[in-house]
Regions:
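Alpha-helical scaffold segments in soluble metabolic enzymes
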Residues: 23, 27, 78, 160, ...
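Helical mechanochemical/support elements of P-loop NTPase systems and associated helical scaffolds
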Residues: 39, 43, 75, 87, ...
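Canonical P-loop GTPase G-domain recognition
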Residues: 127-175
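Short glycine-rich substrate-engagement loop in P-loop NTPases that contacts/grips substrate
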Residues: 68-77
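Conserved nucleotide-binding/hydrolysis micro-motifs of P-loop NTPases
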Residues: 40, 64-66, 97-100, 123-128, ...
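Conserved G1/Walker A P-loop phosphate-binding module
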Residues: 1-68
Length: 175
């Protein structure tokens, strides 16, 4: 019997604090989240792993960060150091759709890193309740990246993330 080989994909979950990164991660890894600490600090490190098709996907849930410029907290420094110095394949940028204008500031900085990125519009239900409509195709075209609508509380749209990761990884789609 031939041993199955999996391709490894390492995904950084990035976004402002409290945008639902951990909720989405819990859906992605179906609760098999490993929580530890970043080396040398007491800040939690959340990591999850999933097999999807021929891929072994590792998700790293980075501490919330508002900007890649000045960092003040230990959490922000950890996120920034990871994004600029560590080896990972793509960014899953989670934003809070009702506060999209605020969150897109970080997105614009992440696009400048040059890594493949998928934009996840979370809390889409709240945006809809506020009368906010998002043209996903147009936003994707403007940012030159894949855009997915989700609801981290119900899991709606999260199943679209796996094929998007594989597509962006395989095609090496960069902004």
């Amino acid at each position: 019997m031939k041993e199955r080989k999996f391709k490894n994909i390492k995904v950084a979950l990035v976004g402002n604090p409290n945008v639902g990164k951990t909720s989405i991660l819990n859906y992605l890894v179906k609760g098999s989240l490993k929580i530890g600490n970043w080396p040398g600090v007491t800040v939690e490190k959340k990591e999850g792993h999933v097999f999807f098709q021929d891929y072994y996907i590792t998700f790293i849930d980075l501490p919330g960060i508002y900007t890649l410029e000045e960092t003040v907290s230990e959490d922000e420094k950890i996120a920034l150091d990871f994004l600029l110095k560590e080896d990972y394949d793509l960014i899953l940028n989670i934003i809070e759709t009702p506060r999209m204008e605020r969150d897109l500031y970080l997105t614009s900085q992440l696009l400048d890193i040059g890594k493949p990125i998928i934009l996840v519009l979370n809390m889409i239900d709240e945006a809809k309740d506020l009368g906010i409509e998002i043209d996903v195709e147009r936003l994707s075209e403007l940012l030159k990246t894949k855009v997915i609508k989700t609801n981290g509380r119900t899991g709606e749209g999260i199943e679209e993330i796996f094929p998007a990761i594989v597509e962006v990884y395989e095609k090496n789609i960069k902004p």
